[in-house]
From Swiss-Prot:
<dbReference type="InterPro" id="IPR014717">
    <property type="entry name" value="Transl_elong_EF1B/ribsomal_bS6"/>
</dbReference>
<dbReference type="GO" id="GO:0070181">
    <property type="term" value="F:small ribosomal subunit rRNA binding"/>
</dbReference>
<dbReference type="Pfam" id="PF01250">
    <property type="entry name" value="Ribosomal_S6"/>
</dbReference>
<keyword id="KW-0699">rRNA-binding</keyword>
<comment type="function">
    <text>Binds together with bS18 to 16S ribosomal RNA.</text>
</comment>
<dbReference type="GO" id="GO:0006412">
    <property type="term" value="P:translation"/>
</dbReference>
<keyword id="KW-0694">RNA-binding</keyword>
<keyword id="KW-0689">Ribosomal protein</keyword>
<dbReference type="GO" id="GO:0005737">
    <property type="term" value="C:cytoplasm"/>
</dbReference>
<keyword id="KW-0687">Ribonucleoprotein</keyword>
<protein>
    <recommendedName>
        <fullName>Small ribosomal subunit protein bS6</fullName>
    </recommendedName>
</protein>
<comment type="similarity">
    <text>Belongs to the bacterial ribosomal protein bS6 family.</text>
</comment>
<dbReference type="InterPro" id="IPR000529">
    <property type="entry name" value="Ribosomal_bS6"/>
</dbReference>
<dbReference type="InterPro" id="IPR035980">
    <property type="entry name" value="Ribosomal_bS6_sf"/>
</dbReference>
<dbReference type="GO" id="GO:0003735">
    <property type="term" value="F:structural constituent of ribosome"/>
</dbReference>
<dbReference type="InterPro" id="IPR020814">
    <property type="entry name" value="Ribosomal_S6_plastid/chlpt"/>
</dbReference>
<dbReference type="GO" id="GO:1990904">
    <property type="term" value="C:ribonucleoprotein complex"/>
</dbReference>
Length: 95
């Protein structure tokens, strides 16, 4: 298994208290494939560098996880299908 860092920018209209439960729903993909969610860090609402879908702000979250590459592809697919997710970025961490 490899280590990955996932940054997610969520729709700012979503309440910050509901961010963690909605992230849990997405991260169930990782847990189902016997991966491990190491850390979830919700940064909160921040101003975007440039507008995304005519929105000036977004709710940032950073997730450290350990899983297989196929699991990351499936997680990215699930996140991109959701309308509440503005942007995602997955980075593979070096050992």
């Amino acid at each position: 298994m490899r280590q990955y860092e996932l940054m997610i920018i969520l729709d700012p209209s979503q309440d910050e208290r509901t961010v963690a439960p909605s992230l849990d729903k997405f991260l169930e993909v990782v847990r189902k494939d016997k991966g491990d969610v190491v850390k979830v860090d919700v940064w909160g609402k921040r101003r975007l560098a440039y507008p995304i879908d005519k929105k000036e702000e977004g709710v940032y979250a950073v997730v450290d996880l350990k899983c297989e590459s196929a699991t990351v592809l499936e997680l990215d697919r699930v996140l991109n299908l959701n309308d509440g997710v503005l942007r995602t970025k997955v980075l593979r961490l070096d050992k």
